[in-house]
């Protein structure tokens, strides 16, 4: 897989360069909320390699390693730290969830509230980005069990890395453990394709869609981003607003109509599915045959943490999965080789 090795070499060069070009001084407080920080940085102008486009990846000869939230079984969900580690470990695509804040900024965050990651209560859409970025996004992460919020204090080794209560790992700073904006994540990894799920729906969806399109266009990333949502209405609204040149995956209603009722699938590049919907097995041979006939790739996300291991990833690839949205990118990289 020489092309993949070339992309890997370019990516690692940029990660190392970015790590060496930034320095930071910050205050500390023993809590799960950080104080304001003062950042001093030296910028080196470097011509980044363009990321492979979604079309390039659909033609790949190997199963794609798609790091779910940066690899949330191995690293704190949706942190800059996790995404950097995923790149080093061989991810082909960074997967992330986005939501809109009270002040109209798109942030990378899965849940409607911050409770599950930060140890603080609050609703993302009711908080400003400044308020969100004070929180410790690694508060509840544990390498022994994620998501588990009833373990002993010592089972959360990065708790306080954002606030100064715990020292961040070597080479990282407190900022790497905060809730990040989509723009900053996409800017930090210009060489990485992105799989972006819009979590907001209803009244919040339009704001999230507008912000996402604005950020994608500002970064000239239309051909290296694929957009997904569980809501078929959100995907339809996104496609109408963005036009046809940003790749998408169908929402649940459209998927059900396609698979069960034989309804035509819209203009999508990829279907993203779990191995099971409840008790219903999705990845049966007829599903892969239907996808092949429709000309779409199949990316699989895990429906249970027990599936997050090398053997299961290998089994999914053997079934016919084109990409694995996984929480352990290092394990998936061994499958891809």
Where are these regions (language model features)?
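Sec-dependent signal peptide recognition
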Residues: 4-13
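C-terminal motif of bacterial Sec signal peptides marking the signal peptidase cleavage site
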Residues: 16-19
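Phosphate-group recognition and catalysis centered on beta-loop-alpha active-site segments
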Residues: 21-36, 41-337
